[in-house]
From Swiss-Prot:
Positions bound to Zn(2+): C901, C904, C921, C924
Catalytic activity: tRNA(Ile) + L-isoleucine + ATP = L-isoleucyl-tRNA(Ile) + AMP + diphosphate
Subunit structure: Monomer.
Protein task: Catalyzes the attachment of isoleucine to tRNA(Ile). As IleRS can inadvertently accommodate and process structurally similar amino acids such as valine, to avoid such errors it has two additional distinct tRNA(Ile)-dependent editing activities. One activity is designated as 'pretransfer' editing and involves the hydrolysis of activated Val-AMP. The other activity is designated 'posttransfer' editing and involves deacylation of mischarged Val-tRNA(Ile).
EC number: 6.1.1.5
Organism: Shigella boydii serotype 4 (strain Sb227)
Gene Ontology terms: cellular component: cytosol
Name of the protein described by the UniProt record: Isoleucine--tRNA ligase
InterPro entries: aa-tRNA-synth_I_CS, aa-tRNA-synth_Ia, Anticodon_Ile_BEm, Ile-tRNA-ligase, Ile-tRNA-ligase_type1, Ile-tRNA_ligase, M/V/L/I-tRNA-synth_anticd-bd, Rossmann-like_a/b/a_fold
Residues annotated for ATP binding in this entry: K605
GO MF assignments: aminoacyl-tRNA deacylase activity; ATP binding; isoleucine-tRNA ligase activity; tRNA binding; zinc ion binding
Domain of life: Bacteria
Residues recorded as bearing N6-acetyllysine in the entry: K183
Length: 938
């Protein structure tokens, strides 16, 4: 028997079947670095329209976690897809390098500044620590396949950036947005510093809930207000609070002007309460026998005075909109030094902003004899005992409630009035302008707009000063007596900024005021405060984007971060940009959800459900991680687990196998010589290229909309359904058995070439390593890297006016599906082995029959059977299978007649008819020794 294997065009490629990504990717990365791939892309894209995604700086502390990976991969997908869409899209990664977490790490190792090290040495240690953290994180980000200017990232601790942060503050001062005030701010007693809103988390805490009576100073005036004469015992206004420790700072009692307040007689005294809360208060304090003596509107009680239970002074009743009937008594204990609402109303009434608490959370000397030096959280019991002793405590109970805590220490924080610097939301219209700017930004998903609008509408002034060592100095001089800013503040700040640009922030602390103030130095003091780190990162639109040459003066198009950044980086950037320039720093803002485990639980080391990106890359490869990110809807929580990653690896294999099939069957194809013109191609091949064209339209639209899970779904559908289960299956016969250089085969290879050129580009933003690998095996002259090019423009499709148009092939797909069902049943019944052992008769209604007949003898190639005939629907025998999908089709199957050709495996009756090739069929003889078969349709 002759060996005809050598006459077949069997697939062949060096592109490996297995990805082995974990082993192969590092080598590719090394090549990208050695070649300076990022630089090559920049050179290729020079002069094109720009798209700038400005990197929100991660904090330079600790290893990267799965959330970091999601963030950087999403950014990289966008930057690469924009490059393929014809944009110059430079990506400059950055790091946030100042602030408390780094100080704490350095403190743990070396002690606090001033103990073993000077503050200057401490800052140097912080700078050193941040630099090592940046290096560690950078390696992991690069390993993810993220392309960017990793050799020249921006760091908020770069001297030039530090100088520009000072300049940003100068512009804000110049525009009139800064003010100073003793104002209650979130204060962590462990950090001994004010905290930004974004540094506050809420946890459940148990506190004492107390009802306290403040006795009226003028009892008769109150009787007159309520129009009563007989009252048994003293009259008191009752407040309710869960922070007894703040009572020493009480300076008023707030009531609502429009609520009805009742004078209620209880045993031996009368109490004033909001009328709607009388019943619940009586239940709480355990009183069943009470009488309402009279009611008045809250407004009637304004400025009546009540005696503080133990501080020895009296306080006024004042009117406030913040009073509610949700809980309590309808009268709110008001301590302007310990709460933002209290502060605002205190300003209105000219109350003292008293703060009897030191930075360490203990009462200052002279507060009250039994409280001086006591930690405020240990003082609650002392205050309760004091109230009991004075007969002012009506009720106490334990209550669990949500309480603000320090994000770093997880310990409860306090509101504490301290002298701080603020960016005012309203004194120069910053709030109104910011709300206007928000409307001009595209928020993705669109609910982000309402979220940030409500935050801006309701936020307090931004406290930008911190009492820290490792941070950008505010660089201000204030007058010793008046505490006013120096009249030449902007000039002086520029002078400081120039020095910082040369020597870093230490230049401020080393600066002798005389050097720039001359004789005035004795009248002014240097402000020791540093800037909130959110000011550092929030000013990068100015300190980085406006100054980096690759951005060439273009504003950022996009900011992309996790959904917690509405109150973090998106907010601080909006505030600073609007305060400086009157406009938002971004055109689009995209947010992604947090990662959760397969059961939807938050990632937590204590539960042990974290997924380490390093482990995933070492086991499965970065492309699997990238595919998981792209295939997950980032607008909600993003679930990840070993099982979910395994599914991503399965999807990856399907895409890789498709790419490998294309490459293997392009063996021996030179596009410069072997390409067949579209009009001369086999119709099915043109249909396949048309499928790729339709897929490309969908995929590009999805990339444009940042809808990456749609990109992956469409890519999978193309690979698995349109190619894998239909086209690639059908063409194997023609591809392997036709004459190597025949139009029948070259037409097929032309289609595969166009499809491969398109597919490799669709993959590139997501499966960057694999796309680079595929690119290296594609035939024809090309640039060295897929990333320097643009989407493939060589695709074409069938015209709707053609008889065998897309709709024709869609129907053929359905027919083939119905035939497959019949073949599967016959295999199950052991009537046939493979589909080529079958011959089918398609009994069809006239319209469908005409379409099927048009394919002539080539119908069998579409159906993968050895025989296929078309007959009238009404002639179908009883055992013909009625199609459920196509009502006008029945399918009958019989065993194919003739012998099996060992070369093409088809069963035909002409095997052995040619003496010289006695073992093969006539079609194979033609392909081996003759002119080769002609194919027109399939």
């Amino acid at each position: 028997m002759s060996d005809y294997k050598s006459t077949l065009n069997l697939p062949e490629t060096g592109f490996p079947m297995r990805g082995d990504l974990a082993k192969r990717e590092p080598g590719m990365l090394a090549r990208w670095t050695d070649d300076d791939l990022y630089g090559i892309i920049r050179a290729a894209k020079k002069g094109k329209k720009t798209f700038i995604l400005h990197d929100g700086p991660p904090y330079a502390n600790g290893s990267i976690h799965i959330g970091h990976s999601v963030n950087k991969i999403l950014k990289d997908i966008i930057v690469k897809s924009k490059g393929l869409s014809g944009y110059d899209s430079p990506y400059v990664p950055g790091w946030d390098c100042h602030g408390l977490p780094i100080e704490l790490k350095v403190e743990q190792e070396y002690g606090k500044p001033g103990e073993k090290f000077t503050a200057a040495e401490f800052r140097a240690k912080c700078r050193e620590y941040a630099a090592t953290q940046v290096d560690g994180q950078r390696k992991d980000f690069i390993r993810l396949g993220v392309l960017g200017d990793w050799s020249h990232p921006y760091l908020t601790m770069d001297f030039k950036t530090e100088a520009n942060i000072i300049r940003a503050l100068g512009k804000i001062i110049g525009n009139g947005h800064l003010h100073k005030g003793a104002k209650p701010v979130h204060w962590c007693v462990d950090c001994r510093s004010a905290l930004a809103e974004a540094e506050v988390e809420y946890y459940d805490k148990t506190s004492p809930s107390i009802d306290v009576a403040f006795q009226a100073v003028d009892q008769d005036a109150l009787k007159a207000k309520f129009a009563v004469s007989n009252v048994n015992g003293p009259i008191s206004l009752v407040i309710w609070t869960t922070t007894p420790w703040t009572l020493p700072a009480n300076r008023a009692i707030s009531i609502a002007p429009d609520f009805d307040y009742a004078l209620v007689q209880i045993d031996g005294q009368a109490v004033i309460l909001a009328k709607d809360l009388v019943e619940s208060v009586m239940q709480r304090i355990g009183v069943t026998d009470y009488t309402i003596l009279g009611t008045v509107k809250g407004a009637e009680l304004e400025l009546l005075r009540f005696t503080h239970p133990f501080m020895g002074f009296d306080v006024p009743a004042i009117l406030g909109d913040h009073v509610t009937l949700d809980a309590g008594t309808g009268a709110v204990h008001t301590a302007p030094g310990h709460g933002p609402d209290d502060y605002v109303i205190g300003q209105k009434y000219g109350l003292e902003t008293a703060n009897p608490v030191g930075p360490d959370g203990t009462y200052l000397p002279g507060t009250y004899p039994t409280l001086d030096g006591v930690n405020v959280f240990k003082a609650n019991d002392i205050v309760v005992a004091l109230l009991q002793e004075k007969g002012a405590l009506l009720h106490v109970e334990k209550m669990q409630h949500s309480y603000p805590c320090c994000w770093r220490h997880k310990t409860p924080i306090i509101f504490r009035a301290t002298p701080q610097w603020f960016v005012s939301m309203d004194q120069k219209g910053l709030r109104a302008q910011s709300l206007k700017e928000i409307k001009g930004v595209q928020w993705i998903p669109d609910w982000g707009q309402a979220r940030i609008e409500s935050m801006v509408a309701n936020r307090p002034d931004w406290c930008i000063s911190r009492q820290r060592t490792w941070g950008v100095p505010m660089s201000l001089f204030v007058h010793k007596d008046t505490e006013e800013l120096h009249p030449r503040t902007l000039e002086l700040m520029e002078e400081v900024a120039k020095r910082v640009e040369v020597d870093g922030i230490q230049a401020w602390w080393d600066l002798d005021a005389k050097e720039i103030l001359g004789d005035e130095a004795d009248q002014y003091v240097k402000v020791p405060d540093t800037l909130d780190v959110w000011f550092d990162s929030g000013s990068t639109h100015f300190s980085v984007v406006d100054v980096r040459p690759e951005f060439a003066g273009h504003a950022a198009d996009m900011y992309l971060e996790g959904s917690d950044q509405h109150r973090g980086w998106f907010m601080s950037s909006l505030m600073i940009s609007t305060a400086m320039k009157g406009k938002a720093p971004y055109r689009q803002v995209l947010t992604h959800g947090f990662t959760v485990d397969g059961q939807g639980r938050k990632m937590s080391k204590s539960i042990g459900n974290t997924v380490s990106p390093q482990d995933v890359m070492n086991k499965l490869g970065a492309d699997i991680l990238r595919l998981w990110v792209a295939s997950t809807d980032y607008t909600g929580e993003m679930a990840v687990s070993d099982e979910i990653l395994k599914r991503a690896a399965d999807s990856y294999r399907r895409i890789r196998n498709t790419a490998r099939f294309l490459l293997a069957n392009l063996n021996g194809f030179d596009p410069a010589k072997d390409m067949v013109k579209p009009e001369e191609m086999v119709v099915l091949d043109r249909w396949a290229v048309g499928c790729a064209k339709a897929a490309q339209e969908d995929i590009l639209k999805a990339y444009e909309a940042y809808d990456f899970h749609e990109v992956v779904q469409r890519l999978m559908r193309f690979c698995s359904v349109e190619m894998g289960s239909f086209y690639l299956d059908i063409i194997k016969d023609r591809q392997y058995t036709a004459k190597a250089d025949s139009v029948a085969r070259r037409s097929c290879q032309t289609a595969l070439y166009h499809i491969a050129e398109a597919l490799v580009r669709w993959m590139a933003p997501i499966l960057s390593f694999t796309a680079d690998e595929v690119w290296g095996y594609l035939p024809g002259e090309r640039e060295k890297y897929v990333f320097t090019g643009e989407w493939y423009e060589g695709l074409f499709g069938l015209a709707d006016s053609e008889a065998m148009n897309d709709a024709f092939w869609d129907e053929l797909l359905k027919v083939r599906g119905e035939v497959n069902k019949v073949i599967e049943q016959a295999r199950a019944d052991k009537k046939v082995g493979g589909s080529l052992e079958a011959a089918v008769t398609l009994y069809a209604e006239p319209e469908l029959a005409a379409k099927l007949t048009a394919l002539g003898d080539e119908l069998r190639f579409v159906l993968l059977t050895s025989g296929a005939t078309v007959a009238d629907y009404h002639d179908a025998p009883a055992d013909a299978q009625q199609s459920e999908v196509l009502k006008g089709l029945k399918v009958a199957l019989s065993k194919a007649e003739g012998e099996k050709c060992p070369r093409c495996w088809h069963y035909t009756q002409d095997v052995g008819k040619v003496a010289e090739h006695a073992e093969i069929c006539g079609r194979c003889v033609s392909n081996v020794a003759g002119d080769g078969e002609k194919r027109k349709f399939a």
